[in-house]
Curated annotation (Swiss-Prot):
Endonuclease that is involved in the suppression of homologous recombination and thus may have a key role in the control of bacterial genetic diversity. It comes from Leuconostoc mesenteroides subsp. mesenteroides (strain ATCC 8293 / DSM 20343 / BCRC 11652 / CCM 1803 / JCM 6124 / NCDO 523 / NBRC 100496 / NCIMB 8023 / NCTC 12954 / NRRL B-1118 / 37Y). Residues 725-800 form the Smr domain. Belongs to the DNA mismatch repair MutS family. MutS2 subfamily. Coiled coil: none annotated. Its EC number is 3.1.-.-, 3.6.4.-. This is Endonuclease MutS2. The gene is mutS2. ATP binds at G336, P337, N338, T339, G340, G341, K342, T343. It comes from the Bacteria. InterPro entries: DNA_mismatch_repair_MutS_C (IPR000432), DNA_mismatch_repair_MutS_core (IPR007696), DNA_mismatch_repair_MutS_sf (IPR036187), MSSS (IPR046893), MutS (IPR045076), MutS2 (IPR005747), P-loop_NTPase (IPR027417), Smr_dom (IPR002625). One of its GO terms (biological process) is negative regulation of DNA recombination. Keywords: ATP-binding, DNA-binding, Endonuclease, Hydrolase, Nuclease, Nucleotide-binding, RNA-binding, rRNA-binding. One of its GO terms (molecular function) is ATP binding. Homodimer. Binds to stalled ribosomes, contacting rRNA.
Amino acid sequence: MNQKVLQTLEYDKIKSQLSDFLSTPIGRQEADALQPITDVHIINYWLQETADAMMIDRLKGGIPLAKLADITPHLKRLNIQASLSATELAEIGNVLRNTSAISNFFIQMKDESIGESLEVLIEQAEQLETLPEVTKSIQTAIDSTGRINDEASYELKSVRGKIVGHENAIKNKMQEFTKGKTAQYLSDPIVTIRSDRYVLPVKAEYRSQFGGVVHDQSQTGLTLYIEPQAVVELSNKLSELRVKESAEEQRVLQELSAELEPHTNEIQQNVQILGHFDFVNAKARLAARLDAMQPTVSVENHISLRQAWHPLLDKKIAVANDISLGDSYKTIIITGPNTGGKTITIKTLGLLQLMAQSGLFITTRQPSTIGIFDEVFADIGDEQSIEQNLSTFSSHMANIVSMLDHIDDKTLVIFDELGAGTDPAEGAALAIAILDKVASLGAYTIATTHYPELKLYGYNRPETKNASMVFDVETLQPTYQFLMGVPGQSNALAIAKRLGFGEDVIGAAMALTDESDQDLNNMIADLVAQRDEVKKNNEELRSQLKATEEKSEALSEEQSKLEKERAHVILDAKNEANHIVAATKKQAEQLISEIRKERLRAGQRGELTEQELQARKGKLDQLRQNDSLEKNKILQKAKKVKELAPGDEITVRSYSQQGTLVKKHKNGQWEVEMGILKMLVDEDDIVKTEATVKAQKGKAKKKQQKIIRKTTSSGSTRASVKSSLDLRGVRYEAALTELDRYLDTAVLANISPVEIIHGKGTGALRQGVTEFLRSDRRVKSYHFASANAGGDGATIVELK
């Protein structure tokens, strides 16, 4: 990628923001070296790294990296068997401790099942070499500040103990001189140190009376710093102990350096991985700062930026726009007056493309797609170029000439005010010729111009689309909204009229205007009016659709309520019938018992035998209502009052789904069509829908009939399936399982579109739903809901 376009599109300013989040030298080196690349596999890998890091940032606050020093020079010295200083060893020890901490961090995430959602960072963490024995040796011997600990060796601890003893003895002896008779010889009753020896500040005139060794004097010469003769021997012994301490410290450092030397390659690998984690952390935190999203990469170079804004603008006030290029057209011509936002629009497309090819998330409010370009060229106008000043026509042309030598079908070209800076007629002609040349080379182009001659360019060139920036004539202010398909409209006369010019001036101006220009402006005005009308109608349709869905949901709830009431009525009726039968049976048994007793007393045999009496009792038993509706033959027979016939609307009891009878097979089974499915069903498993309706009485019957009349052609199954699924508050795995089950039900009921409500929250569930829908074959398309319908807290799904 050429370096000029990185400067022109302010790519380095994005990298500068990235550096705000870095804490390691290797991470900074990686950020400094960041460039757009063209390998789609590496780009997707980098984007997935950023996605993993964003998930860790949301769930754990990021990868817990400490600030690390650059230990690469230390490792090079170890490779030549040099002995490192305590500070250098402490810095290596800090890296090793961080290595262990990061390794344990990812192991814990894996144990918590979070690691299953991390596609690449877990694998990188598994390459860390923790070196526990070496880490422990350094941690025992040297603290984080570079001081050698007493526990570094037995000898060092012993020598330091003796040093402390001698220092205390010397201090006690010196304190005696600050009191009593000798105190009068001192400038101040304090003990100080000169040349590593304990001394007292003695007045110069008492030098002979005090005695001892003079080590220093004050600037005035009035005070001498004298070591009393009584502590000279102790001080000499203390110096000897300090020499031993230094020798032992050096031995410890040499021993630790020798222990580290075989592991320099592993430590260097750890440094690289930790630095890369620092860089990935920074990418995630930059994405969070910018409120950026992960783009999809299109190898066909189909760019679709949905609700995109320039990442260097304040996202709270920036106007987001939809920009598409490369699908049905490869050239966009943005016409219209200056100051309307044309330049920032083309810069947005160019910079977001560079960011995505660098593995960075892009500033869009809805899922978007970027291409893969070997080169991106940009010729940006002078007054609006932030970093580059190309002020003359010749410099623009020289820049474009250099581009043409490198343009092919894998190039994105950005022109700002193409052909400006010269005679308008010649400039417009040259602009058209340049655009034709670039198009013949197969490049993808987005260009801005204020030449009216180019307004017709998009209509008579293949794979070319007109566009413009919306201008509010009422407020005389640009809206910065990007409008595809409509060329820029000249508003000069309309603005002049609103500002107070009389009809005579406006009329004279119109008379001087070329008639074809007036016709073109009128045509553009008509297109804009039609577009506004379509937009208004779409909003009304969306509002009506939402109201219809709400009514459908209410009707579905009412139907469910009626079905429950019906079930209660049937249950109460069955209980009452069973009660009557039980009472009748009891009376019959009493009657039979009396007959038997009477016959026994009379010793007679009547015509009514014992078997006949039992048979009559059995008939009474059969009157009892069966508790299981599926096994109750009387109720089943009642449900099949009419003969089944093809075309009948029926209910399959085992599936609780409605369908239509197609034909009856020889084996007695019926072929039933339920939504997009067809299956064979036993006749006993089929209930006519009309029997269900007729079983209801009174007010419940009327309400049920009204519901059935108002449901759509897909029947009661469609009405009972809601057009939305609320996953808020549901755990991640359970939510995806529920989503899969819901899509099955919606497809079976032939419902589309449907709304998946996942909320905003941390964004983990939203990302999970998006990934699920992207790979699901049942999904035709999906997008976030409109801002007034939940925004990115809900996803609208079109099913196949």
